């Protein structure tokens, strides 16, 4: 059995996987609550095969329950969401990772990404960045593309690459996934550098720079943990990005 922040999952006696999530009604948006199901239609993305689901409303509390059944992973989850040491990942793994993220961005959807179950909008991006980096005036996102929106090391497998837990996916600013994974890697500098290298086109775009500040704001903002080992690296990168945006 695997327990995560919002769900619990376990292997079944027919060699499939069932993931059960409990979500408050006020956290279910107008687009519904079928991320894993709708992600099954994505082309070119390595993910477990979706089999079916059951959804029900709690009789006693204002919450919904959802159980999704999928195929098994071609490996094990790489680790916790934020890693403290470098994982052993092959070059084949990194190629599959890059191919899947490229393919994901080529798909189309009407869904909107909900990182941390919060719908991402232009206003959210602007408020998040300016709340920590007020010197950044223009926070306009130019390109919105499909994103996993919870891309971290607990949601990918190895040695075989697969991307799972799709409940938050939808359109988001270009670079959202790359920046999210980079932030989850900052405690291991060599890993964070590899993520930036693999997704350099995303990070080099203006939207990618804004997403770098978006994730840095979460690490450096008022609610940040003072002992977070990522603070120093996030602050250093944020200073570089802010300077770059100000000079054009």
Model-derived features with residue positions:
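An alpha-helical support segment within catalytic cores of ATP-dependent transferases
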Residues: 90-97, 103-149
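Active-site Asp-x-Gly
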Residues: 158-198
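Conserved ATP phosphate-binding architecture of protein kinases
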Residues: 5-11
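A conserved alpha-helical element in kinase catalytic cores
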Residues: 14-69, 76, 81-103
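A conserved long alpha-helix in the C-terminal portion of kinase-like catalytic domains
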Residues: 182-248
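Short, well-ordered beta-strand micro-motif
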Residues: 11, 69-71, 157
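Conserved catalytic-loop position in the HRD/HxD motif
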Residues: 145-155, 160, 165
């Amino acid at each position: 059995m695997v327990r995560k922040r919002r769900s619990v999952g376990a292997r079944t006696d027919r060699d499939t996987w069932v993931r059960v999530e409990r979500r408050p009604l006020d956290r279910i948006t107008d687009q519904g609550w079928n991320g894993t199901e709708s992600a099954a239609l994505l082309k070119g993305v390595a993910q477990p095969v979706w089999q079916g689901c059951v959804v029900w409303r709690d009789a006693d509390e204002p919450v919904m329950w959802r159980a999704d059944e999928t195929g098994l992973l071609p490996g094990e989850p790489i680790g916790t969401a934020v890693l403290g040491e470098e994982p052993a990942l092959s070059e084949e793994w990194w190629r599959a990772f890059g191919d899947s993220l490229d393919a994901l961005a080529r798909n189309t959807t009407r869904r909107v990404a909900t990182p941390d179950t919060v719908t991402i909008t232009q206003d959210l991006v602007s408020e998040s960045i300016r709340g920590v980096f007020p010197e950044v005036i223009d926070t306009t996102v130019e390109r919105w593309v499909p994103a996993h929106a919870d891309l971290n090391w607990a949601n990918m497998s190895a040695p075989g690459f697969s991307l799972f837990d799709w409940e938050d996916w939808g359109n988001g600013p270009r670079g959202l996934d790359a920046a999210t994974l980079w932030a989850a890697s900052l405690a291991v500098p060599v890993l964070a550098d590899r993520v930036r290298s693999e997704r350099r086109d995303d990070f080099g775009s203006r939207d990618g720079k804004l997403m770098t500040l978006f994730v840095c704001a979460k690490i450096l903002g008022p609610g940040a943990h003072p002992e977070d080992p990522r603070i120093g690296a996030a602050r250093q990168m944020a200073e570089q990005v802010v300077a770059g945006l100000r000079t054009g």
